[in-house]
Every structure is written in structure tokens, then in C-alpha cells.
Amino acid sequence: MKPKDTPRKNTNRDDRSGPVIALFVYGTLKSGFPNHDRFCRNAIDIQPATVWGRLYDLGAYPALEVPEETILAYGTADPRADVATQAHYAAYVPAHAPHTQPSGDWDPVHGELIILPDPARALPPLDYLEGFRPGRSSLYQRVLVPIQCGLRTSPAWVYVMHGPFRGQLLSEGRWPR
């Protein structure tokens, strides 16, 4: 699956008057892919970003594994609570902190930081798409991790899978190849 050409979004701060959710995407939710158009078209900002992890190609979509020690929080069924958790950690993750590699064989995974307005409306369809069912067995988990966007480090939600993985490890950290 190849993305179509979609320009980066940068809108003015007036769009951020209400609560927003920060989401790191690395697969079919990236700009130019059909799921982006369906679920993220209302994004108020999209920027290139990276996270430490391992990216696997599962064919039609990728899976991300992140180091357990980088997980700041686990997503819930309450978008308002998740916005509050994100804000809490944003106050404690220094914006200019070095994005140091965790112990182990982790790679930088490349994707996009997407800022979505109205989390109460935006998160439930994304959770459904990703098979995230808080408190139940789920295909993906939504977790809060530090991401690097330019020279800034900030917390963002990301959908991760727990192994074992049957796909091919993408050591270059990009999907599709």
C-alpha cells in the first residue's frame, strides 16, 4: 500500500481552543492512506515524529512494539480522562529532554504526530478501528509514550501490539518500505 501525496497541515492556534489529543501514527493512519482520510481528516496539526520501538510488517498493516519502561500510561474508555493524563505527563516530560535510546535493541520508528480536536468524538472510532477494548483482550493497546517531534519531546498516544509477531521486522523503522 502506497500513500497518496498529502501536504502537511499547520493551522493557527485558534483551532486548539478546546481539548486536543496527541496521537503518534506509523501505519494506515498516516497522511495519504485511506484510514487517515476516514479517521484523521479533522487533524489540526500533523508533523513528522519518531518513537523508540520495533516496527513489524504484517502485510496490510504494521505493528509497533515499544519498550515497557517508556510507557507512561494506558488508554481508557474515557477520552476526557485520557486528555487529562496526557496533560499531566506533558507537564513532566521536559520539552527539550534528550530522546535517549532505551536499553535493548530498539530502533527509531518514523511516523507522524497528529493533533486531533474533540477527543470524545475522535478517539472511540480510532479505538474501534485498532481493536482497542479497554479492560478486555484487544488486538492493540493504546499507550502514552514520549515521542520526538523535531527538537521537542512530548507525550503522545500510540496503538501498540504485544508479540509474538509473525511479520517481518522493519529495522529501518518505516512502513511501508
Report the location of each language-model feature:
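Glycine-aromatic micro-motifs
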Residues: K2-R177
